[in-house]
Amino acid sequence: MAKRILIAGAAQEVSTFNPVFSTYEDFNVSFGDEVVERALGKNSEVAGMVEVLQGDGDVEIVSSYSAGATSAGPLDKAGWERISSEFLESLKPFAGEIAGALFAMHGSMSAETELDPEGYLLEESRKILGEEIPIVYTQDIHGVTTAKMLKHADGVAVYHTYPHVDFADSGARAARQLLRQINDGVKPVTVRVPIPALVRGEQLITETGLFGNQVSYLKSLHDDPRILNAGFQIGNPFTDVPELCSQVIVVTDNDEAFGREVALKAANEFWGNRFEMHADLVPLEEAVATASKMKGPIEFSDAADAPSSGASGDSNAIVAEMIRTGYPHTVLAPIVDPSAVVRAVEKGIDGRITVKLGGNLDKRFTPIEVKATVISASDGTFPLEKWPSIEHAGPTVVLQSDNYTFVVFSRAINLVDRAPFFANGLDPKDFHSIIVKSPFCEPEFFDDWCELNIIVDAPGSTSADLLSLGHTICARPMFPLDDDVEFNAEPQVYSRV
């Protein structure tokens, strides 16, 4: 009789500092077989899981539930109660009927009434599925693995790339560990080394930065049969929760000593590089003044308002400074403003409107009044260039106001590539200046053809100026929030052997 393996998931990255709560309606929810059906052919964790499981030859894949949303503010009470209930209820028919479970999670989820959603789901899943059933889950490199998660799971497969491109590979690693447990009887022992550091900046790019050295080392260990999974999480500095930190997580086949050895090596090397892992931010006024004198194209990285990190997407800070100083070049600017979209749709294509843009959601931004022509409108639904998601921005319009072209969305979406522009008939290469609301994108999207990428010190709920955010929940002292932080490596061991 074939082994039945269950697949389920719940994932969202959150910025605690985004004042707008997420709701249930922000999530794409799938039930039953459609969880797998929707993932097939995509670079997704579930697709990676399925590929490995299908290669076993003696596995029946079943799926129960998946809920995923664009990064945003914390999930509100009602939304969390519904998603957690649906997730757990979906597992109950499989109690006593499966050989193992794989969960696709994020690690930086947070809710109005629950600071460790993934930990809660794993704890309750264990109660439903039983203590003997192996459970392995995936997490983002920006996830915040907690003691509760590790206590109730057998292992975790963490992304090895930033910017993220190894979604399917991470799912595959989770599935391989699960099959080794079921088929070969390996005994997972997890070693975690928390590091009191929150980091940002170009040195975190795994292909080129210092952080990539630690990730490459841990990735190389997967050739060793003693290693079931090994990864490094830098947390999400914008998810202010009790166990927020950077951390190494190594899962071995019952070899605690080896797990300690490799985890400590990676952790200590990372700590030694901490002062290099920060963003070199350019003051807003200087950024605009510098770009105004350049031939272009110029990329303005507005990571402080990156929806992919949990921001609201309605910052107008860079454009406001451009308007104030009479910026002479063409500008392509994405922004979330549902009320402006409504006005534009009512007016129709080629209509002239006067609207206030920005600050509709996050009140730290002051709306700016613009007179604009409605160029186009769309339903805001499109696939990203490399990520495995379909974005749903809601009704979307393009507005032209003098030298400014605004792509105005009804809802925040991932702005990690050029797809939001292409989907609305715009090519970023046709503009002198492009505002990119993401900390980092694949080089081909902007960096490779722009004269300069200016990482702007703008306000926002995902600012790389971490001291500006106001953490109140995470453990302290924490680098760089506090001075003279010491790191005394203390490995924590979790085992269900």
Task: Show which residues each predicted segment covers.
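Glycine-rich phosphate/diphosphate-binding loops that line cofactor/substrate pockets in enzymes
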Residues: 1-2, 54-58, 63, 89-101, ...
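N-terminal amphipathic/basic leader segments beginning at the initiator methionine
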Residues: 2-55
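Short acidic, glycine/serine/threonine-rich loops at helix termini
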Residues: 17-21, 73-76, 113-115, 146-151, ...
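Cap/lid and interdomain-hinge subdomains that line or gate substrate/regulatory clefts
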Residues: 60-62, 71, 109, 136, ...
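Extended hydrophobic packing segments that form well-structured cores
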Residues: 63, 85, 271, 382-497
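Charged, often glycine-rich, active-site loop that binds/positions anionic groups
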Residues: 65-86
